[in-house]
């Protein structure tokens, strides 16, 4: 962490030596006839300095050897130090900043020599009493900063902070001007004080340990600024892209897995042993995706950053709910993936033998193993957001290790073993010499092709999640060690938005999000786009019933249109043939009666 004790002298040096030396030189006009009166250029974006704290921003004094940009950079540094540290809390008031700005950019006036007709620019310096009040409120001792400091040049001493007036030596003449009372500026301005520069957020802590536990992150000790949320690990647009990726995949996986659960588990007329396992795997994936969908509906950034400058913690219900759900469902996913890998391998290995239905044992064991760790974690207030987390997760590494990665790693290894055994069986099938056994096993292999593909796809995602998390934990010191450099960047950079902590590559984090949210999409590609799914929906009772209703409605509409057409034609015929005799009408009725008899006979045969 950055030491406040080491930084305090720097501030005083800036006040007394670095900038005072420049400005002191500039007030002796025989030495600086190139000084000018300029209009204040305005503060740097996101960094409040002197906007609203100048008596006359349209006319400020700038000497010939300096520039507004250079002076502003020094002023920003002093202002950053004052804002950053709690030791200067009493300095954060309009009077301090009015004095600072009157010193950095003194009001400029012009004087024209009546003899030489040369116009000179000269500054109106802040008064001694204003400086004295500032050192008192900031609790700065006179040994570090004396308001009686004088600058001597060519055997003439000038006060940096004049008590009443300043005499300017202009050629052979002298010109006297009253000092500027900066308290009048402070009392008349309505500008609110920017306590911390972005991306830091102002927060006065009375109990830093408690504040850290509820989501505040302090970049240094003895500071009133906390790290903004989202954390400055990536740029704002990069965080938005990460959140957008998570939202889209969560909603998509949620919808697709819900469709598959309904298809294979509810409307499926013949639920097989593998269908039961797949339904449980898909239900687990649905819960996993639903945890992300909850964040989406609540606003992902709002969930992870419930307050400005505070990351989500155990006191935020939505964060806790999504973390708890993600924890349990992820353990369910890896368990049912392991069960599926075992069942596929064992079915091919024991081809021709009747398999027992072990579903109820799998169900009871998986529920116990999956939900005990989350229950323990939630009782210990372990779920929270964090600087690098795109979702709410376990806070401490030990809980992540024993409550999640230990069971996850065990089932990942077991599933990997079954996957290797499955590959061996495939090799045996391909290279086997016994034709009958080869044909029967190849038939089973063809039937289990999709479960095999799904196992490989799930395994690749789960393995990446495991490797990435372990790598992050092993390199955490890289990010924490970058905090002092980050704090220094905030204090010295002209654009604080360019200051970032060291972070994992954004591509790796993006693929991490992809891997944890994409399971539902993979499942739909494998099981949703299939002949079996089409057949289940095609012959489903409700689909058939709705289809019949639509067909009846279509037929009725067609018949009605045909009847209307016939009636219209008959009406036209009557009007045209109104003079026809009764013999013709009788003959038409007889012909109609014969045709109706034929139609009835045909319907009877069909029935």
Curated annotation (Swiss-Prot):
Cystine connections: 37-108, 50-101, 127-179
Glycosylation site residues: 63, 133, 155, 164, 190, 222, 298
Signal peptide positions (record): 1-26
Name of this chain's protein: Frizzled and smoothened-like protein J
Region (Disordered): 559-607
FZ domain location: 32-182
Domain writeup: Lys-Thr-X-X-X-Trp motif interacts with the PDZ domain of Dvl (Disheveled) family members and is involved in the activation of the Wnt/beta-catenin signaling pathway.
Species of origin: Dictyostelium discoideum (Social amoeba)
Keywords of this entry: Disulfide bond, Glycoprotein, Membrane, Receptor, Signal, Transmembrane, Transmembrane helix
């Amino acid at each position: 962490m950055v030491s406040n004790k080491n930084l305090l002298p720097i501030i005083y040096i800036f006040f007394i030596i670095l900038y005072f030396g420049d400005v002191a030189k500039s007030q002796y006009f025989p030495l600086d006839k190139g000084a000018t009166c300029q209009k204040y250029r305005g503060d740097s974006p996101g960094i409040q300095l002197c906007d609203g704290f100048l008596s006359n921003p349209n006319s400020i004094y700038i000497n010939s050897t300096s520039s507004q940009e250079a002076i502003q950079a020094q002023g920003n540094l002093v202002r950053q130090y004052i804002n950053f540290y709690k030791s200067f809390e009493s300095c954060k008031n309009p009077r301090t900043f009015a004095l600072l700005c009157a010193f950095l950019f003194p009001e400029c006036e012009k004087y024209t020599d009546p003899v030489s007709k040369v116009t000179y620019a000269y500054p109106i310096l802040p008064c001694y009493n204003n400086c004295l009040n500032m050192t008192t409120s900031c609790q700065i001792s006179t040994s570090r900063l004396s308001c009686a400091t004088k600058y001597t040049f060519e055997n003439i001493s000038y006060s940096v902070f004049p008590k009443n007036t300043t005499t300017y030596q202009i050629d052979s003449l002298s010109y006297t001007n009253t000092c500027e009372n900066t308290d009048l500026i402070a009392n008349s301005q309505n500008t609110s004080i920017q306590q911390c520069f972005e991306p830091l957020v102002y927060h006065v802590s009375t109990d830093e340990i408690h504040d850290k536990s509820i989501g505040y992150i302090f970049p240094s000790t003895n500071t009133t600024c906390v790290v903004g949320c989202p954390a400055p690990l990536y740029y704002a647009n990069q965080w938005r892209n990460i959140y957008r990726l998570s939202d889209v995949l969560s909603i998509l996986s949620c919808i697709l897995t819900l469709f598959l659960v309904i298809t294979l588990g509810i409307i499926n007329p013949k639920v097989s042993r593998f269908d039961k396992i797949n339904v449980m795997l898909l239900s687990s994936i649905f819960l996993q995706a639903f945890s992300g969908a909850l964040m989406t509906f609540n606003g992902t950034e709002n969930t992870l950053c419930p307050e400005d400058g505070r990351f989500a913690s155990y006191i935020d219900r939505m964060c806790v709910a999504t973390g708890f759900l993600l924890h349990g469902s992820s353990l369910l996913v890896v368990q049912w993936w392991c069960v599926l890998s075992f069942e596929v391998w064992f079915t091919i290995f024991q081809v021709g033998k009747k398999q027992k239905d072990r579903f109820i044992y799998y169900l009871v064991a998986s529920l116990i193993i999956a939900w005990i760790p989350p229950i323990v974690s939630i009782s210990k207030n372990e779920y929270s957001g964090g600087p690098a987390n795109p979702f709410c997760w376990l806070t401490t590494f030990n809980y992540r290790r024993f409550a999640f990665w230990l069971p996850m790693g065990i089932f990942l290894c077991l599933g990997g073993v079954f996957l290797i055994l499955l590959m061996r069986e495939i090799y045996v099938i391909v290279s086997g010499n016994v034709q009958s056994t080869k044909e029967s096993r190849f038939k089973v292999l063809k039937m289990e092709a999709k479960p095999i593909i799904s196992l490989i796809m799930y395994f690749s995602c789960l393995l990446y999640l495991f490797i990435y998390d372990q790598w992050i934990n092993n390199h955490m010191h890289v990010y924490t060690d970058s905090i002092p450099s980050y704090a220094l960047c905030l204090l010295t950079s002209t654009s604080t938005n360019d200051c970032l902590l060291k972070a994992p590559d954004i591509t790796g984090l993006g693929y991490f999000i992809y891997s944890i949210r994409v399971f539902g999409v993979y499942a739909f590609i494998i099981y949703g786009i299939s002949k079996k799914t089409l057949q289940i929906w095609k012959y489903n009772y409700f689909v058939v019933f709705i289809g019949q209703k639509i067909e009846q409605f279509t037929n009725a509409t067609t018949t009605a249109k045909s009847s209307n057409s016939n009636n219209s034609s008959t009406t036209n015929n009557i009007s045209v043939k109104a003079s026809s005799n009764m013999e013709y009408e009788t003959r038409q009725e007889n012909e109609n009666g014969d045709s109706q008899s034929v139609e009835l006979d045909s319907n009877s045969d069909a029935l």
